[in-house]
């Protein structure tokens, strides 16, 4: 099993095509550039995050965030869930080496808003049917509100993926609905996985609605296949992106999820919600 069999054409374009920068996302904490990449007459819109633009963090090795984004794609692809847009490592670019990821085109409507119509903040006590309340708080003017997310199968997958990769920053705005190819149907994607795979437990997410629930059998079967891959070819490939200790901890998290067969609960030693939530 090797994840590069998925989206091989897009990965090749991302890694080897000619990259042209068209703009910058000014709200991002690290340099996040929007552009196009072209190879053999095929052009793809993408996000490019050069290593040189990464802000140093006390709890992650310098220059490693882009590699973690690639690793998150590899794990998602190995699970067969395709929750992470195709993401590849570039050895060169306008600002040096870094990761390139296919741009997710969102449709008009709620899916284009932060949270993609799947994560939201509503007045307290007004959680609609089919949604799960995570926490009550107060907004900027002191009104009581609730953070909620949909009871959606794609979010169950994303919750498991975040537990596997130890995602420290699953904000509502990191959940997208859209497509990466013009002829695709819209689907759910997760982005911004630079602060994942830490060897210490750092899971922070807005998707706590399934905490403690049993993990569905199909998801457990996918985790079993992932576990086999981590002990083989996939693990060998991820060893080029992560440290040995990080890879071992990833294997242990997968084994624990399979053993417990339950969605994880918030931990005590680390804030369980990202801030801001969007």
Predicted regions and their residues:
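C-terminal catalytic region of ATP-dependent kinase domains
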Residues: 61, 179-278
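Conserved kinase catalytic-core segment
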Residues: 81, 134-202, 250
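Conserved ATP-binding subdomain of kinase catalytic cores across diverse folds
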Residues: 13-139, 161-168, 179, 191
